[in-house]
Every structure is written in C-alpha cells, then in structure tokens.
UniProtKB/Swiss-Prot annotation:
Function in brief: Accelerates the degradation of transcripts by removing pyrophosphate from the 5'-end of triphosphorylated RNA, leading to a more labile monophosphorylated state that can stimulate subsequent ribonuclease cleavage.
Name listed for the protein in its UniProt record: RNA pyrophosphohydrolase
Biased composition (Basic residues): 187-196
Keywords assigned by UniProt, alphabetized: Hydrolase
Record-linked Pfam families: NUDIX
Its EC number(s): 3.6.1.-
HAMAP family reported for this sequence: Nudix_RppH
Domain Nudix hydrolase: 6-149
Length: 205
C-alpha cells in the first residue's frame, strides 16, 4: 500500500520501561539497530498495525504493554536513492509513519524475537531515551528526532524529567533546518504547526 506521493503507511514503536530506557534491537544479519516498525495493511488502523507489528517483531501481546500516546499525523522519511526500486509498478520513495509510545509492563521473558519464521531482529537491549537518534541509520535520524520530540512529554510524565532528559545536541541537529538527516518534512521543507507540537494521548477504553 503506497500513497500517491510514493510513501508507504507505516507504524513505529517506542517501547519504554518505567525508568525511561527504551527497547533497541539489531536487525537480523545486519549491523543496523532500530526501533520496531512495519507497514500497515489496507484493512488496518494504525493502532491495529502497531499491535500486530509488536507481536511479530518482539513477541509481546497487548497485555504486556500500556499505550501511552502517539504522534499526531504522519511523520515522513525518504529512502536513499539506492534503496528505491524504480522498476516496480508502484515506486516507494519512503515511509510515512505514526509513532507510538508504549510502557513495557510485562516481564523480559515475554520478549521473543523468534516469534515468527522470519524474525526481524536477533538481539536487543535497553538504551537511554535519546540514544537511538544518534545511532540509527543516517536517513532515519530526522524522523527519530521528530518522533521522540513529540513523545518526550509523555515519557517524562512516566519516568520523570531526569530520566528522559532534554533533547541532546545531536538530536537537535537532526531536527533543525538544513540538516542532512532532517528528513522529508523537516521545518525547512514543511513549516511546523503549533497544533502538532504535542503528542496526543490515546484512550485505551
């Protein structure tokens, strides 16, 4: 499913412990680390896609997490030109994502990376909240900075300001105009709207 602009609808997951540490995983047979993420099916809502991807990539079920909130609207990033398959009928130039913040309420024994026959990850660990912005592949740094910036107030309400902290300089540079990591809808290319500055809370009822 690719939109008319060439972006594939996708969900991203920030799984956080109560102490503010977030789940960080290594892709199978690759050196790259990232948050869980995945494409939406045509018949899914973003929330439904998020729970499916959570189960497929981490083995966790809805009872192992609490949904704290999500980014408002879509956040986009472009794929590097070498990764764009120009010979396909529908050309995908990037992803447009809704990012979710989940509190991990289960036990670490519930985390099973081999839940499916084709696992996405082969190793995981807990890292500081802003660590992923500095260590994810370069073309995703802008969208990671924007997603975590939106979700940080919710994370701080759970873990406390000291645990989550302020956005570090590296993350700030990914967000600022003119940064090579800023992504498709950086402030330089698409003006920020005041109403989109906060993460929205989601009712679990």
């Amino acid at each position: 499913m690719i939109d008319p602009d060439g972006f594939r609808p996708n969900v991203g997951i920030v799984l956080m412990r109560q102490d503010g540490q977030v789940f960080w995983a290594r892709r199978v047979r690759r050196d790259g680390w990232q948050f869980p993420q995945g494409g939406m099916n045509t018949d899914e809502t973003p929330v439904e896609a998020m729970y499916r991807e959570l189960r497929e990539e981490t083995g966790l079920l809805p009872e192992h997490v609490e949904l704290l909130g999500a980014t408002p609207g879509w956040l986009r990033y472009r794929l590097p030109s070498r990764a764009v398959r120009r010979n396909e009928r529908q050309v995908c130039i990037g992803q447009k994502q809704v990012w979710f913040l989940l509190q991990f309420t289960g036990d670490e024994s519930h985390l099973k990376l081999d839940h499916t026959d084709t696992p996405e990850f082969d190793h995981w660990r807990w890292v500081d909240f802003w660590y992923p912005v500095e260590h994810v592949v370069m073309f995703k740094r802008g969208v990671y900075a924007r997603a975590l910036r939106h979700l940080a107030p919710l994370a701080q309400s759970l873990a406390g300001p000291a645990a989550v902290g302020a956005m570090p300089q590296r993350a700030l540079e990914a967000w600022l105009p003119g940064s090579s990591a800023a992504g498709h809808d950086s402030p330089r290319k698409r003006p920020r709207k005041r109403s989109g500055a906060r993460a929205m809370r989601i009712n679990n009822d």
